[in-house]
């Protein structure tokens, strides 16, 4: 069993990035849990959890309150049962939340980004859609 933990926040990211990623992951013939954390974000609508719960293949989705309790107080959400093997995939929000989860679970962190990058020493690999950003990151030694 492998855990695939996605971090995202706003409705746009849930619709544009999480949904197609989950659909592709569902095509893989592997035993997996797909967990989605929606850390605190000023752009959050509050409806992300409901939308995520309607997506086929997501094992569980956690709101910002559950995320904070887990990160700060080590109180796991009831339906979060991490295995020994997994990874974090950043799909939006603040990079630090994906990094915190990666450190807590000892999972590598991967990130998809269109505009910036953060915590380069803590992110194993970046996935980019923009050649200009790739050139900037390369110039910066990332």
Give the positions of each predicted feature:
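Nucleotide-activated donor-dependent transferases that construct or modify glycoconjugates
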Residues: 1-11
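Active-site and donor-binding regions of nucleotide-sugar-utilizing enzymes
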Residues: 11-142
